Amino acid sequence: MKSSGAGAAFAGASVADAVPLAPLTTLRVGPTARRLITCASSEQVIATLRRLDTERLAGQRDPVLVFAGGSNLVISDALSDLTAVRLANDGITVEGNLVRAQAGAVWDDVVLTAIEHGLGGLECLSGIPGSAGATPIQNVGAYGAEVSDTLTRVRVLDRGSGQVRWVPGTELEFGYRTSVFKRRADDGLEIPSVVLEVEFALDASGRSAPVRYGELAAELEVPVGERADPRAVREAVLALRARKGMVLDAADHDTWSVGSFFTNPVVAPDVYERLAGSVDGPVPHYPAPGGVKLAAGWLVERAGFGKGYPVPDPGGPEAPCRLSTKHALALTNRGTARSDDVIALARTIRDGVRSVFGITLVPEPVLLGCRL
């Protein structure tokens, strides 16, 4: 990696040539970008993207990837002509019960800051890797909570007009792991708008949001629907996530992943009834708008893909990409995986679940230059 000396063209942002992207993602897979532009402020993000989009209109630019934490990306190793723009604007401010975070802020730092200021509402989202700006794009959620529960507005750069404005959360068309941002994106490289800042309105009473998730309630030893100390909820969530390999640890290959690779499918009630009648024992399910939500991890394991799949033969080599030994939904890089290895395993699992149950799992991460 070397500096190109072109930072002045991007309002002082750092510019480097030939930068490997794999170390900048939680899956640790990806190509060497032709150019990496790191923006330390929202002003640098705006200036950089305006310039790159002007170059695009003139037909003079490479494909542009905009990212921050790299926690929800599978980038094809073939995308060697990329200009990557990394959001490193990481300011966090608190005013009363409002928490504002710039797009590049580490998400778990945002959660911890809120809790340290006595604010409840984000604690169930503790330990989720990635950046604050990415959370509204797919309406990040865990343990019965979603970003849309407390998000009031986002500050965005419209790349078509070059304008910057605040957009109310009510206009973001949130759904299960989706939003207007995700639906309008083409292939992850031609996103029409970029989140610069997010704002949350939280509970200043010193209580958590109601604990809606049974596993978390059991960990806290409280009834479902009860509120608790946000710090206690955070610690319980982190403990649950750690046991599932969902807290980043450079020494643990079970955490080299994008988290859950597939979303929990929502099916029609008759599909659920048919499934429940065809297997022994209960089928994990939850009510959802428009149908019944099934547990993707249960489907994966019941289709024959247990934790650690594919398990190496005794004394034999380990596959470069395997399911986590702790969580059946995490596809993990065992140290040498490339994007093709990840996609191949994802296809095998998707096709296997479809063959057994007639249900097609949908990938949760953004796939850049590759597809299932």
Swiss-Prot record:
Its cofactor is FAD. GO terms for molecular function: FAD binding; UDP-N-acetylmuramate dehydrogenase activity. The active site is at 177, 260 (proton donor), 364. Gene3D superfamilies: 3.30.465.10, UDP-N-acetylenolpyruvoylglucosamine reductase, C-terminal domain (3.90.78.10), Uridine Diphospho-n-acetylenolpyruvylglucosamine Reductase, domain 2 (3.30.43.10). The keyword Glycoprotein does not apply. PANTHER family: UDP-N-ACETYLENOLPYRUVOYLGLUCOSAMINE REDUCTASE. Cell wall formation. This is UDP-N-acetylenolpyruvoylglucosamine reductase. The gene is murB.
